[in-house]
Amino acid sequence: MDWQKITEKMCDFIQEKVKNSQSQGVVLGLSGGIDSALVATLCKRALKENVFAFLMPTQISNKTNLEDALRLCVDLNLEYKIIEIQSILDAFIKQSENTTLVSLGNFAARIRMSLLYDYSAMKNSLVIGTSNKSELLLGYGTIYGDLAYAFNPIGSLYKSEIYALAKYLNLHENFIKKTPSADLWENQTDEADLGFSYAKIDEGLKALETNDEKLLKILDPSLIAMLKNRMQKNAFKGKMPEILEI
């Protein structure tokens, strides 16, 4: 892939969305992971200024992720704000009768979304998305949480391609080497949740997307079954709410 042209196209896309909406800039959640780090880097290249980063950890958030996110803010000279959301999460736990790790993770994602949109309104800015194509196809995200945003410059890149672009743009090796994680609970990792590495997941997703029957026959049947199940079960996450026509 021609990463120079792709980078230019992404930066043009960001500039166009901000200009056409008559916004001042963009707001994003910076987790310390590679996806949000890449989007922050692209925003800085595209806009130069008015890129606002929110770091919103809980008490179980990986401290290394916070350190990496802070370092990136300094390196890119971003305006940023740290908001500890544990107190909000604790209030939810007190009111809920049956909290699980998944429900807590989803609620944390929706807290972050609410804070981003509140700040974006205050700053007349757009919330920018950080989900990659692998996550979007699988519905691996929280509806009205991290899947809520005005636009997304990296949603056409598979996770494996995210790494390639990050290397091209010289992102710090900490982002490239760390294990992918939504950091929803302690020691949580994407690949443990999904049951396969992103390399295998992307291979399967590409085979399904292109209907490569030859490749589909030799791939792990349990991988293909998992992908199809998640794509079907979570397809609603990528659609607007249906409205009855009368």
Curated annotation (Swiss-Prot):
CDD domains xrefs: NAD_synthase (cd00553)
InterPro entries with a match to the protein in the record: NAD/GMP_synthase (IPR022310), NAD_synthase (IPR003694), NH(3)-dep_NAD(+)_synth (IPR022926), Rossmann-like_a/b/a_fold (IPR014729)
Binding residue positions for ATP: G29, L30, S31, G32, G33, I34, D35, S36, T130, K159, S181
GO CC, one annotated term: cytoplasm
Amino acids binding deamido-NAD(+): R110
Protein's UniProt keywords contain Chaperone: no
GO molecular function terms attached to this record: ATP binding; glutaminase activity; metal ion binding; NAD+ synthase (glutamine-hydrolyzing) activity; NAD+ synthase activity
Single GO BP term: NAD biosynthetic process
Sorted UniProt keywords: ATP-binding, Ligase, Magnesium, Metal-binding, NAD, Nucleotide-binding
EC number: 6.3.1.5
Record SUPFAM superfamilies: Adenine nucleotide alpha hydrolases-like (SSF52402)
Binding residues for Mg(2+): D35, E135
Catalysed reactions, as listed in the record: deamido-NAD(+) + NH4(+) + ATP = AMP + diphosphate + NAD(+) + H(+)
Pathway recorded for this protein: Cofactor biosynthesis; NAD(+) biosynthesis; NAD(+) from deamido-NAD(+) (ammonia route): step 1/1
Quaternary structure annotation from Swiss-Prot or TrEMBL: Homodimer.
Physiological role: Catalyzes the ATP-dependent amidation of deamido-NAD to form NAD. Uses ammonia as a nitrogen source.
Family per similarity comment: Belongs to the NAD synthetase family.
Name listed for the protein in its UniProt record: NH(3)-dependent NAD(+) synthetase
Source organism per UniProt: Campylobacter jejuni subsp. doylei (strain ATCC BAA-1458 / RM4099 / 269.97)
UniProt gene name: nadE
